[in-house]
Amino acid sequence: VNLGNELTPTQVKNQPTKVSWDAEPGALYTLVMTDPDAPSRKNPVFREWHHWLIINISGQNVSSGTVLSDYIGSGQPKGTGLHRYVFLVYKQPGSITDTQHGGNRPNFKVMDFANKHHLGNPVAGNFFQAKHED
């Protein structure tokens, strides 16, 4: 994943093995992966579809966090063009004890989640694009 590069669904079907950002020692973070283009950029009626949500990550140790939504790779419908898949990292003001992610995968609003948990603005982000493989 490198700032908008195009990847195939096959390349991203498995959970990433390396996710990194400039983390403060002892700080807790939230990581979310979302598709703002569901089911398509022209008609994003399911905006946003979240593909991954982890809270209470200690530093950059993603495996130390609490998984609220397991990773799902890109799976865009045929004929819907390129979708953006956005990774955002938020520094938490403290541990999050509410383990409800606030909705189903479609129509998830990362900003609403961030506001609910007082996360402020993202401290890191990246994205890739993918489209249906024929």
Swiss-Prot record:
Q: Domain of life, per the record?
A: Eukaryota
**SUPFAM superfamilies reported for this sequence:** PEBP-like
Q: What is the residue range of the signal peptide feature?
A: none
Pfam families, from UniProt? PBP (PF01161)
* InterPro entries documented for this protein: PEBP, PEBP-like_sf, PEBP_euk, Phosphatidylethanolamine-bd_CS
Gene3D superfamilies for the chain: PEBP-like
Matches recorded under PANTHER family: PHOSPHATIDYLETHANOLAMINE-BINDING PROTEIN (PTHR11362), PHOSPHATIDYLETHANOLAMINE-BINDING PROTEIN 4 (PTHR11362:SF82)
Name the family.
Belongs to the phosphatidylethanolamine-binding protein family.
What is the name listed in the Swiss-Prot or TrEMBL entry for this protein? Protein D3
